[in-house]
């Protein structure tokens, strides 16, 4: 391990000072110079305080000028209409902000009302569609009536078809001819049963 030569702190301090001098001579901007953080924060705080003082002074000057203008306007016998631009200049910043927020609130309420009206109109359209689907229109022509759907389509009546007819799909069953059911209480026999000796089948 090679040992680094011991450097005196005085020499290091002198080197830093010489660097700052060189940077200043070259006319670098102030942000390029190495400044500790605390100094930078203190500088920002000073600038902030100066700005606040300037604003307070402007406000005081405005308050002082305002009563003088009121007195001069009251002494004048003829009433003059003040233009809108001068009135707006007299309004302090807080009042301007207040008016701006009021205007934003009005716009927002207007926008919300328009949205509510649009939602209400959409709901009415949906209700009208539902009602028209529940009560289909009466159509004289049967071909036109085919296009209107009924809410409950009639189910297949099982007593009309033979046993297990419901098992087959409707498309197949429409081509098959069905014989109607016979009453089981009646005897199945030919008309000549009196003449022949055939026993009727149950």
UniProtKB/Swiss-Prot annotation:
GO biological process: what's one of them? response to 11-deoxycorticosterone
- Ranges of compositional bias, category Low complexity: 70-80
Main location per UniProt?
secreted
Cellular localization per UniProt: Secreted
Task: Give positions of region: Disordered.
Answer: 1-25, 51-84
Please verify whether the record's keywords include Lipoprotein: no
State the superkingdom. Eukaryota
Job description of the protein? Important role in the capacity of milk to transport calcium phosphate.
Q: What's the name of the protein?
A: Alpha-S1-casein
| The organism of origin for this protein | Equus asinus (Donkey)
């Amino acid at each position: 391990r090679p040992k680094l030569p011991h450097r005196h702190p005085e020499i290091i301090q002198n080197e830093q000072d010489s660097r700052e001098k060189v940077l200043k001579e070259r006319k670098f901007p102030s942000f390029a110079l190495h400044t500790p953080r605390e100094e930078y924060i203190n500088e920002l705080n000073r600038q902030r305080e100066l700005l606040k003082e300037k604003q307070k002074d402007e406000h005081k000057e405005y308050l002082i000028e305002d009563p003088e203008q009121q007195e001069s306007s009251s002494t004048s016998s003829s009433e003059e209409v003040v233009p809108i631009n001068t009135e707006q200049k007299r309004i302090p910043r807080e009042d301007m902000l207040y008016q701006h927020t009021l205007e934003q609130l009005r716009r927002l309420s207007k926008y919300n009302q328009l949205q509510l009206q649009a939602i209400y109109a959409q709901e009415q359209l949906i209700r009208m569609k539902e009602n028209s689907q529940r009560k289909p229109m009466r159509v004289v022509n049967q071909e036109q009536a085919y296009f209107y759907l009924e809410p409950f389509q009639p189910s297949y009546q099982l007593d009309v078809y033979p046993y297990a007819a419901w098992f087959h799909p409707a498309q197949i069953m429409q081509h098959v001819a069905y014989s109607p059911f016979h009453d089981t209480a009646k005897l199945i026999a030919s008309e000549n049963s009196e003449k022949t000796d055939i026993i009727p089948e149950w």
